[in-house]
C-alpha cells in the first residue's frame, strides 16, 4: 500500500510539473542540509538525559509562476546517527508560495525553517523530527516589525481518527529602542468514534516589553520582561480539575559581540501545562543561560555551538548543541 501511494504521488508530481512548465517563467530549485547534535545532561523529574544526533538532507524543485508566486515539490530525509539506516520515513514537501515586500504566504506542506513560537510553547525537539508545517502560514512585514499567523494540521478529520491542529500568532513590534513581542498558541486534540469524542485542548499566550540598545560597543544587546499564561483542559480525564491554568513571569536577555553571544531566559511562577512545550518549564522556576559561539555565518551556511546551563527548580543541569545549516537555491531557465 505504501509503495502504491508513493508511486501515485510521484506520478502526480511529474504530471503537475509537466503542466506547470508550459505556463511558468523559470524552473527553481532548493537544496538543504542540517546537522543536529543535542546532548542533554538532565537529572530532574522534568527532563531526562538523551543525545540527539542526526543529519537531514532536503531538496525541492518547482516553478516560478510569476514574480510573486511559485509552486514547489520535494522532500527531506533524516538519518539519526546510531539508528538503523532508513529507520525514519521520508517527509514530503508540496506547497504554494506567494511573496512580496510585505507578505510571505505558504500553503500546503512546507519546511518550518524558522520557529514560529519560543520553546516555552513549542519545544525544539519537535522540529528535529517534524520539520514541516502542514497547513498555512502568513508572515506580514511592516515598518515596525512583523507578525506571523499559523494554522498547522496534524491528522485527518473524520470518524475514527484523531483530530489535531495548532493555530497561533506571534510577532514583534519596534518603537525606536523599545519593542513588544506577542505570542498566542492553541492546540486542539480530539479522538474517538462518533458520539464518544474526548477533547483535550491546551494553549498559551504572552506579552513581553523590552529595550534594545543600539550603537554601543556590543553588536546586539536587548532585555525584555513580561508574562506567559497557559491552560489545559481534558473532557475525559476525571483525575484533574479541568481546566488547569498557569501564570508566570517570563524575562529574556541577549547580548552579542562578533562571534560570541549570551542568550538567557528566566521563567518563574506556575508551571506550564503544554504537552508540546519544553517540559523544563513545567517546574515553574526555570532559568536557561546559553553561551554561544557563532562559528560561521554566511548567506548559505550557518554553524553554531551552544553550551547551555539549566536551572530547574533548584538544580543546575547542562546541555550542549551543535547546529550546522546549509541552504542553496537557484533557477534553471527554460
Question: Where do the language-model regions lie?
Answer:
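Bacterial N-terminal signal peptides that target proteins for export
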Residues: 2-10
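Exposed, low-structure sequence patches enriched in small/polar residues
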Residues: 54, 93, 144-150, 154-160, ...
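Surface-exposed coil loops of outer-membrane beta-barrel proteins
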Residues: 41, 104-172, 186
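Short, glycine/acidic-rich beta->alpha junctions
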Residues: 53, 86-88, 130, 163, ...
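Hydrophobic h-region of N-terminal signal peptides that target proteins for export
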Residues: 14-23
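Secondary-structure transition into beta-strands, especially the periplasmic turns and strand N-termini
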Residues: 68-69, 103, 145, 260
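Flexible, solvent-exposed loop segments that connect beta-strands
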Residues: 43-47, 119-120, 237-240
